[in-house]
From Swiss-Prot:
Residues modified as N6-acetyllysine: K35, K77
Cellular localization per UniProt: Nucleus; Chromosome
Tissues with expression: Expressed in bone marrow, liver, lung, muscle, pancreas and spleen.
Pfam hit, one: WD40
Protein's job: Protein, which is both involved in DNA repair and protein ubiquitination, as part of the UV-DDB complex and DCX (DDB1-CUL4-X-box) complexes, respectively. Core component of the UV-DDB complex (UV-damaged DNA-binding protein complex), a complex that recognizes UV-induced DNA damage and recruit proteins of the nucleotide excision repair pathway (the NER pathway) to initiate DNA repair. The UV-DDB complex preferentially binds to cyclobutane pyrimidine dimers (CPD), 6-4 photoproducts (6-4 PP), apurinic sites and short mismatches.
Family, per entry: Belongs to the WD repeat DDB2/WDR76 family.
GO molecular function, one term: ubiquitin-protein transferase activity
Subunit structure: Component of the UV-DDB complex which includes DDB1 and DDB2. The UV-DDB complex interacts with monoubiquitinated histone H2A and binds to XPC via the DDB2 subunit. Component of the DCX (DDB1-CUL4-X-box) E3 ubiquitin-protein ligase complex DDB1-CUL4-ROC1 (also known as CUL4-DDB-ROC1 and CUL4-DDB-RBX1), which includes CUL4A or CUL4B, DDB1, DDB2 and RBX1. DDB2 may function as the substrate recognition module within this complex. The DDB1-CUL4-ROC1 complex may associate with the COP9 signalosome, and this inhibits the E3 ubiquitin-protein ligase activity of the complex.
Stretches for region Required for interaction with DDB1: 68-79, 87-98
Disulphide bridges, residue numbers: none
Modified how: Phosphorylation by ABL1 negatively regulate UV-DDB activity.
Name under which the protein is recorded: DNA damage-binding protein 2
Positions of region (Photolesion recognition): 334-336
Species in which this protein is naturally found: Mus musculus
Amino acid sequence: MAPKKCPETQKSPDVAVLLRSKSRRGPQELEPEAKKLRVQGPVSSRTCESCCLLAELSSLQIPSRSSSIVRDLYQHKLGKATWSSLQQGLQKSFLHSLASYQVFRKAAPFDRRTTSLAWHPTHPSTLAVGSKGGDIMIWNFGIKDKPIFLKGIGAGGSITGLKFNHLNTNQFFASSMEGTTRLQDFKGNILRVYTSSNSCKVWFCSLDVSAKSRVVVTGDNMGHVILLSTDGKELWNLRMHKKKVAHVALNPCCDWLLATASIDQTVKIWDLRQIKGKDSFLYSLPHRHPVNAACFSPDGARLLTTDQNNEIRVYSASQWDSPLNLISHPHRHFQHLTPIKATWHSRHNLIVVGRYPDPNLKSCVPYELRTIDVFDGSSGKMMCQLYDPGYSGITSLNEFNPMGDTLASTMGYHILIWSQEEDGSQKDHERL
């Protein structure tokens, strides 16, 4: 069956776009001019083009509230509305609320770009962020206390994966280019080292953990994937890909199901109970370009993949051989940019991803904005674009917290928190 392709230029009338004024921000908060991409052409022409594009985005309609959520719940209780229609109503209401989302917290604690991001599983205002220098910040932006900052080794210490320990949420797992996968506490103590390459030529690029099965899985730059128990026992170590394993993901509902994504242009699906060698995968999903990420949906029924060029795919567990949707979207690879990865919303059937406009694409318009794009997971249609002129860089990582009401984005050195917030509590946290 031919996959349904959704051009990224195809926008629904029901699209909400967030545009924020720079007037609230002081000159010291704006992105340094040296970091901005140079644009050829007269200033007057550039200003005109940008204003026209902003005006076009502003004219897009915001989804209207079709009915009361309370009424929808009541109709469902009476059996007059299906669960699917109730979910659609809740999603539409959430999309309407996105129109009022804004950056209300900001931090820039690192001297190198951010490389990884993880939300705390039980504290909706707490997240961990890692940097290219190996630094890790544990930040509860809901309180005024200073964040926990764990200093890394600097060059060569890039944090490639972060996961909180669900069995002890004052601990976290981390994989790094330093050549280790480890368990640490918030004081910086290393409690256990799961893998150590002891070589500068081998490092670990990806990480996932299952609290239910008590296993840790990590992938390295040589194509190996290692499965360990949380007490440190190695269960197996196999070369599953020809090149770097950029991402590993355990299915949240069936944690014996593993997805691995590689720059060898494949994503593979594995059954951990039946792995006997590199050829014992259940499915191999070929891509046209190297793959940055493969993420299971919260219900475990679908898989979202992001390549290193301009394609996002959605696969269904009922039909692995062909993607349900191909979404054309610019997010090309660049050496000094943290790879862009699309993620699922934690509650709704939505996909969130940062945009890196590509002038080589026919769909690219002059001075296209670096927005955060939100797509419908079923149709592949763009539903919303978030943009703040005060934070105009490329957001490589974007993830909603477990409650689904707050979005964290990383943009170069910066960490941005988007949410609905009253003006009286809007405060920017500068360098911490």
